[in-house]
């Protein structure tokens, strides 16, 4: 099992981060690349974009079972828009894919499942994503089919692999959408079964930065951008609410948090818990 080592330099001098945009036409070739490097870059940071939430709770504080019921209702009814993946090695380096231009690469998958003219969504969420550059019309025309994405992801080494670790931020919905796509069915009816499928697909080394914030000496709060600012971590590429960019910012925030607050005992004891659901 690989141990995550401290990395003081989150963006080495001279390295340019490039987002690899994935559409239907290059889906298979990009998964071929990922499959070839996953053994050397087993740390996966993930973010998704989806059409907001259409079912909401009247209660400010609810237990994990109630929160899961709400999550399931939304995920079952809605469709994924983007998935961002950042792969890293044990020292925090991004894959260069043999490039000699001092570039590191991350991935952003664009899906065709969601049709803004047809499907349920939260209008404010859609407007926010439009402002951040998501082209819903192009997604419908050129985007990835979730069924083919699932087939390729299942055989890529990203899932059902005990050697990988996942790093996320407030990720119950993110994993919910991935589980829905990978299993090709609605989410399990109960939180306990959701936990079981999570372990099968993603293993036990799942780190949710939002959960880990509770155990930092310095008080951290808010969303990803606010936490990153507090940790003095800059966005290396792209904009907020772009899944590829957010996956990289999540990885950098995790690295900084680990180096500041988890030097003595490491972050491993906080693995396997999704914020709000107390998963695992």
Swiss-Prot record:
Domain of life: Eukaryota
Catalytically driven reaction(s): Exonucleolytic cleavage of poly(A) to 5'-AMP
Names of required cofactors: a divalent metal cation
Pfam families according to UniProt: CAF1
Annotated GO biological process: defense response to bacterium; defense response to insect; nuclear-transcribed mRNA poly(A) tail shortening; response to wounding
UniProt-annotated location(s): Nucleus; Cytoplasm
Chief localisation class: nucleus
InterPro entries for the chain: CNOT7/CNOT8/Pop2 (IPR039637), RNase_CAF1 (IPR006941), RNaseH-like_sf (IPR012337), RNaseH_sf (IPR036397)
Name of this chain's protein: Probable CCR4-associated factor 1 homolog 9
């Amino acid at each position: 099992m690989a141990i995550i080592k401290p990395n003081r330099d989150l963006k080495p001098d001279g390295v340019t981060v490039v987002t690899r945009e994935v559409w239907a036409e290059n889906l298979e070739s990009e998964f071929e690349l990922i499959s070839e490097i996953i053994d050397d870059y087993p740390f996966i940071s993930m973010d998704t974009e989806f059409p907001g939430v259409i079912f909401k709770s009247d209660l400010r504080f609810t237990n994990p079972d109630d929160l899961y019921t709400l999550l399931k209702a939304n995920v079952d009814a809605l469709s994924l828009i983007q998935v961002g993946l950042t792969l890293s090695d044990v020292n925090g380096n991004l894959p260069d894919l043999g490039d000699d231009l001092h570039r590191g690469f991350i991935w952003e998958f664009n899906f065709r499942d969601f049709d803004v003219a047809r499907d349920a969504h939260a209008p404010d969420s859609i407007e926010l994503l439009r402002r951040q550059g998501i082209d819903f019309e192009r997604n419908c025309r050129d985007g990835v089919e979730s069924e083919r994405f699932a087939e390729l992801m299942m055989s890529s080494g990203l899932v059902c692999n005990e050697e990988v670790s996942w790093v996320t931020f407030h990720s119950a919905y993110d994993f919910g959408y991935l589980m829905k796509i990978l299993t090709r069915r609605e989410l399990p009816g109960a939180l306990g079964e959701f936990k079981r499928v999570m372990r099968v697909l993603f293993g036990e080394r799942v780190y949710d930065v939002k959960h880990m914030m509770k155990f930092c000496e310095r008080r951290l709060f808010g969303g990803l951008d606010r936490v990153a600012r507090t940790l003095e971590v800059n966005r290396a590429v792209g904009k907020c609410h772009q899944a590829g960019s957010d996956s990289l910012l999540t990885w950098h925030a995790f690295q900084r948090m680990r180096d500041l607050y988890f030097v003595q005992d490491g972050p491993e004891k906080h693995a396997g818990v999704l914020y709000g659901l107390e998963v695992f």
